[in-house]
Amino acid sequence: MAVVAPRTLLLLLSGTLALTRTWAGSHSMRYFYTTMSRPGRGEPRFISVGYVDDTQFVRFDSDDASPREEPRAPWMEREGPEYWDRNTQIYKAQAQTDRVDLETLRGYYNQSEGGSHTIQRMYGCEVGPDGRFLRGYLQDAYDGKDYITLNEDLRSWTAADMAAQITQRKWEAAREAERLRAYMEGTCVEWLRRHLENGKETLQRTDPPKTHMTHHPVSDHEATLRCWALGFYPAEITLTWQRDGEDQTQDTELVETRPGGDGTFQKWAAVVVPSGKEQRYTCHVQHEGLPKPLTLRWEPSSQPTIPIVGIIAGLVLLGAVITGAVVAAMMWRKKSSGRKGGSYSQAASSDSAQGSDVSLTA
């Protein structure tokens, strides 16, 4: 079985959060597909994860002993066997479609048979505070690079290269944008509203961040101040550094928001400062769960060590998420992402259980 390097998976997963921000008061439902070929080691591995806002609610992995879509959120336990049966069949059909697409794309790019390749897809819809359709999106990627994207008008495509233009012409001839637009404005919105209602206790909560600062000597003359925010939900958060009240954006090292493994998120921002000048620097934290923004300043008497146990536990859980849900995480490393090949085929009717009836063929 082909193994994707952990660092690659971390990048994929963290990328999910970077560009899936919704407009204020809006909600989104997104699906992330990843298919990885492994020549000589069996069928490609197909993984799908679904998110409502920042919460994963379903998962499917073709490598499971008995591949079946599984719930990943409490409210999904309400769905009956018909829901899971139908969506499991959708995913199995998608896995076979992707297997063909991997061969097609390999031909488009004149690649040898021995290499491992990856197809990724992100698609979904977003509703405003009133529950009405706001926008839809679909992005495909091949081997980690943009391939083709459905434009915001949901009527036209942007192809990344000559190979993707072949797919674009096929999809235009088949009027796939029209079919996708109907799905996004109809089925997708209907199921998003249902999940928002059934999962409101989880999805409408706000967990404020637990914050602290750590100090790490770099040399005799410099030290790194790192501002931590842990255990917050939703994922949207702002960490900024100031020196004497002036923003230090250019000098700030900032990591993407990452899952903590327990339904909450983590993030840190760091600056390198002259030793002895730490008091001139402040970290400012803004989050929906805070009554007002927080301001942190390094106190020499405070403990300089990071709560390693908590961080490691989060990373271990993150690893579990990646191994099974991974993926998808795909792209959206700042609006990059999405891509794949071949042409669409309708894998299920518009009343499919979760509205994940977007599948492709080459």
UniProtKB/Swiss-Prot annotation:
Residues 115-206 are annotated as: Alpha-2. GO terms for cellular component: early endosome membrane; ER to Golgi transport vesicle membrane; external side of plasma membrane; extracellular space; lumenal side of endoplasmic reticulum membrane; MHC class I protein complex; phagocytic vesicle membrane; recycling endosome membrane. Glycans are attached at residue 110. Its main location: membrane. The chain crosses the membrane at residues 309-332. The keyword Transmembrane applies. Disulfide bonds join 125-188, 227-283. Residues 333-362 are cytoplasmic. Residues 1-24 form the signal peptide. It comes from the Eukaryota. The keyword S-adenosyl-L-methionine does not apply. Residues 25-114 are annotated as: Alpha-1. One of its GO terms (biological process) is antigen processing and presentation of endogenous peptide antigen via MHC class I via ER pathway, TAP-independent. Residues 207-298 are annotated as: Alpha-3. This is Class I histocompatibility antigen, Gogo-OKO alpha chain.
